[in-house]
Amino acid sequence: MQYRRILLKLSGEALAGKDGYGINAEMLERFAEEVKEARDMGAEIALVIGGGNIFRGVSDAAKNMDRVQADYMGMLATVINSIAFQDALERLGVYTRLQTAIKMEQMAEPFIRRRAIRHLEKGRVVIFGAGTGNPYFTTDTAASLRAIEIEADVIVKGTRVDGVYDSDPETNPSAEFFPKISYLDVIRKNLRVMDMTAITLCRENTLPIVVMNMNEKGNLSRLIRGEHVGSLVHA
């Protein structure tokens, strides 16, 4: 097994599917099955899910709002997605714990690092909601932070494309693909792998990032088995 402990970062838009907003039940179930398959192989899986399918603090909808208030709304959106994903996993028989950076005791545990690690060691999937609990930080940064805190072997960013390109392959068919690329090159080329705070955190803690297509069935399991999937961002 190439990676035993993984933090999977999914965008909220991924859960929306072709609808572009809200939660698509088919996409939710598909991603939950991918996570279950990886967990059943013996991997320890944690997740961070964005909230852009419901609300994004830097979106047009929030342009006249106070940024802090808008970001808190975005954090709540991530919790909605996290609860939905927890439910999807538990319907598949996967024990799942939701931990949030903001206390919501009726529906989630508070984030406690040692408890999260213990859950993972017991074979439970752990979902981290509400970002970092602080405004001005993205869920990419939250994913990097949590991955470092739980001592993950890798952070996997699930996207709609096959990995890292020099431009958007959905609009530029001749975009150059990078099977491997360094953190510094990502920063120098200003590639939209993750935001710069997240990339810098990973670089400073030598946490590798794999960017891959989560719409490709079985990709997560192939990665765990040691097959080359997507793009590797490394030192």
Curated annotation (Swiss-Prot):
Q: Which UniProt keywords are given for this protein, alphabetically ordered? A: Allosteric enzyme, ATP-binding, Cytoplasm, Kinase, Nucleotide-binding, Pyrimidine biosynthesis, Transferase
Q: Which SUPFAM superfamilies match?
A: Carbamate kinase-like
Q: Does the keyword S-adenosyl-L-methionine apply?
A: no
Which positions bind ATP?
Answer: K9, L10, S11, G12, G52, R56, T159, Y165, D168
Q: Does the keyword Disulfide bond apply?
A: no
Q: Which reaction does it catalyse?
A: UMP + ATP = UDP + ADP
Query: EC number(s) for this protein?
Result: 2.7.4.22
Q: Which InterPro entries match?
A: AceGlu_kinase-like_sf (IPR036393), Asp/Glu/Uridylate_kinase (IPR001048), Uridylate_kinase (IPR011817), Uridylate_kinase_bac (IPR015963)
Reading the lineage from the top rank, the first entry is: Bacteria
Q: Which positions are annotated as binding UMP?
A: G51, D71, T132, G133, N134, P135, Y136, F137, T138, T139
What is the protein's major site of localization?
A: cytoplasm
User: Quick one: signal sequence residues?
Assistant: none
Q: Name one GO biological process term.
A: 'de novo' CTP biosynthetic process
Pathway-wise, it operates in: Pyrimidine metabolism; CTP biosynthesis via de novo pathway; UDP from UMP (UMPK route): step 1/1
Q: What Pfam families does the annotation carry?
A: AA_kinase
Recall the GO molecular function terms of this protein's record. Answer: ATP binding; UMP kinase activity
**Sequence segments annotated as region (Involved in allosteric activation by GTP):** 17-22
Question: So what does this one do?
Answer: Catalyzes the reversible phosphorylation of UMP to UDP.
- Fill in the subunit field for this protein: Homohexamer.
Q: Write the protein's name.
A: Uridylate kinase
Which species expresses this protein natively? Chlorobium luteolum (strain DSM 273 / BCRC 81028 / 2530) (Pelodictyon luteolum)
In the UniProt record, what gene is named as encoding this protein? Answer: pyrH
